[in-house]
């Protein structure tokens, strides 16, 4: 039996949608939100998830490579306290913002600042799509002119990463459509 799970997400809540991994805050984590879950656990060597990893040792460590050549590594863990039991996921070490993950959460204040800076730079009228979760939706120019998308970068530990065309998705048919 196959069960499809689709979590409720709203782009205006601070997440960016990119690839097929689930990420969440895990220990050890410096400068993180308080966390205390009685249903969180690292996976034991005997678990099927660990057995499926291409590793010679039993440490349940993983490495995942992205299409652009970057990668992440960490350990496998499970969460049993949600409405979907036994969710296994990777706990990446020292991730600050990972623009290539399925879900990267920004605290609301941080997301608002990024969204406002982007809106200020794109210089187009916005379309109210808050009911669909699209908080940064823009009206196309009526004269058919080309939209100039602002440069977007992220500073991570002193390294400036150019995110242009890597972490921004454009869905012109979804904005303003009912």
From Swiss-Prot:
This is Aspartic proteinase nepenthesin-2. GO terms for molecular function: aspartic-type endopeptidase activity. Its main location: secreted. The active site is at residue 98. Extracellular proteinase found in the pitcher fluid of carnivorous plants. Digest prey for nitrogen uptake. It catalyses: Similar to pepsin, but also cleaves on either side of Asp and at Lys-|-Arg. Optimum pH is 3.0. Retains 80% and 60% of the original activity after incubation for 30 days at pH 3.0 and pH 4.0 respectively. Unstable at pH higher than 5.0. Inhibited by pepstatin and by diazoacetyl-D,L-norleucine methyl ester (DAN) in the presence of Cu(2+) ions. It is found in: Secreted. Its EC number is 3.4.23.12. Keywords: Aspartyl protease, Hydrolase, Protease, Secreted, Zymogen. It comes from Nepenthes distillatoria. Belongs to the peptidase A1 family. Optimum temperature is 45 degrees Celsius. Thermostable up to 50 degrees Celsius. Retains 44% of the original activity after incubation for 30 days at 50 degrees Celsius.
